[in-house]
């Protein structure tokens, strides 16, 4: 009985304490009107969105820069090609892809091109104006860092820059002219071009009294080099653009290493590139170097059909091309044989029924090929 009374007393005390705490909590809650009806943005401050503001500012800055710098590249291309237009139209019957279209072809925000045809000794000319990606701040910064820290020492391609390139193909009637490889290359581009261009593997590197210390001569034979250097007005035109000249290549061999004999296509042509340095303003943009390089290409194109080498020189050049073709054929055959051995090994791992099915498919494929030939 005493225990029951004691338990009842403890229960009553506990209930009283809890009731007092609830009353106190209700009073505190009612005393704070802000907690009674808190608004959605009552406690939101602009400083809580500082990161978002920074991200939006960077985004709008990027968009603004992309639009303005893209227009700047277009203005540079228009001014550059416009200043060369008179020379192009004077030398060629057609400037641009068609009579009713713009002569400047927009390939990308950083690349513009054009086309020339209709001239003696020249089949066609493709020109390309590659501009630095000014519209992309991130790419621009990364390229600047690479240029400063590494330059083109660790790169397998020419560094991104403002440059103007020519790709001139000689006319078909010049296909029987003497074949050779000749190049004037800037020392900064020599290693890269030697690695990526197949045709320059035919040449030897040497210095020349005709060239400054910044450039080297890459040629198959001294007689070929001397013939080009002695073309009237050629050296005067080259010297006008030599400061910006990256390479001037006369070749008949493919620039990309041929994988098979079908890829080994010879085409007499002249390729050249100049680097446009420090475009600070459109008003100060000059294309004197572009005009000089263009004139140099035409002088060589007109002289190539007239070149005649001594018999021993012609024999040496012909032997080098025959050997190169045989090496390509041999490498292609070795690759095909290796692939065939691998295929035979794969067949041997199949079951007998699968081997028969595969052999039957091969037999049917050969029969269809014969039927097409007939």
From Swiss-Prot:
Membrane topology: Single-pass membrane protein
Biased composition range(s): Basic residues: 364-374
Residues listed as glycosylation sites in the UniProt record: 287
Single Gene Ontology MF annotation: calcium ion binding
Keywords from the UniProt entry: Endoplasmic reticulum, Glycoprotein, Membrane, Transmembrane, Transmembrane helix
GO BP of this protein: endoplasmic reticulum calcium ion homeostasis; protein insertion into ER membrane
Main location: endoplasmic reticulum
Keyword Glycoprotein applies: yes
Record-linked InterPro entries: CCDC47 (IPR012879)
Residue stretches spanning the membrane: 49-68
Superkingdom, taxonomy of origin: Eukaryota
Localisation per UniProt entry: Endoplasmic reticulum membrane
Stretches the record annotates as Disordered: 335-374
GO CC field: endoplasmic reticulum; PAT complex
Basic and acidic residues composition bias: residue spans: 349-363
Protein family: Belongs to the UPF0674 family.
The protein's name in its UniProt record: UPF0674 endoplasmic reticulum membrane protein C2G5.01
Lineage: Eukaryota, Fungi, Dikarya, Ascomycota, Taphrinomycotina
């Amino acid at each position: 009985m005493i225990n029951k009374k004691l338990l009842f007393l403890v229960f009553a005390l506990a209930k009283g304490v809890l009731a007092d705490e609830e009353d106190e909590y209700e009073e505190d809650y009612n005393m704070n009107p802000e907690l009674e009806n808190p608004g959605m943005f009552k406690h939101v401050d602009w400083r809580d969105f500082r990161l978002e503001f920074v991200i939006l500012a960077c985004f709008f800055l990027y968009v603004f820069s992309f639009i303005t710098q893209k227009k700047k590249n277009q203005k540079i291309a228009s001014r550059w090609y416009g200043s060369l237009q008179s020379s192009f139209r004077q030398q060629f019957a057609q400037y641009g892809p068609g009579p009713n279209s713009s002569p400047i072809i927009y390939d990308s925000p950083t690349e513009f091109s054009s086309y020339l045809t209709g001239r003696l000794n020249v089949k066609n000319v493709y020109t390309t104006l590659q501009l630095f990606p000014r519209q992309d701040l991130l790419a621009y910064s990364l390229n600047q860092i690479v240029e400063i820290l590494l330059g083109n020492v660790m790169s397998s391609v020419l560094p991104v820059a403002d440059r103007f390139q020519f790709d001139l193909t000689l006319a078909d009637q010049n296909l029987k002219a003497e074949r050779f490889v000749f190049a004037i290359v800037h020392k900064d581009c020599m290693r890269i071009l030697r690695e990526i261009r197949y045709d320059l593997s035919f040449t030897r590197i040497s210095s020349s009294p005709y060239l400054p210390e910044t450039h080297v001569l890459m040629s198959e034979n001294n007689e070929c080099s001397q013939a080009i250097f002695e073309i009237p007005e050629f050296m005067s035109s080259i010297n006008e653009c030599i400061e910006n000249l990256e390479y001037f290549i006369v070749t008949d061999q493919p620039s990309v290493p041929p994988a098979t004999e079908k890829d080994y296509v010879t085409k007499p042509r002249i390729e050249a590139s100049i680097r446009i340095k420090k475009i600070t303003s459109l008003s100060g943009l000059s294309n004197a170097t572009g005009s000089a390089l263009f004139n140099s290409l035409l002088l060589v194109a007109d002289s190539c059909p007239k070149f005649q080498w001594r018999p021993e020189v012609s024999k040496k050049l012909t032997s080098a091309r025959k050997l190169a073709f045989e090496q390509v054929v041999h490498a292609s055959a070795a690759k095909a044989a290796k692939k065939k051995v691998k295929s035979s090994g794969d067949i041997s791992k199949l079951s007998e029924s699968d081997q028969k099915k595969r052999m039957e498919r091969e037999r049917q494929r050969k029969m269809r090929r014969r039927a097409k030939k007939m």
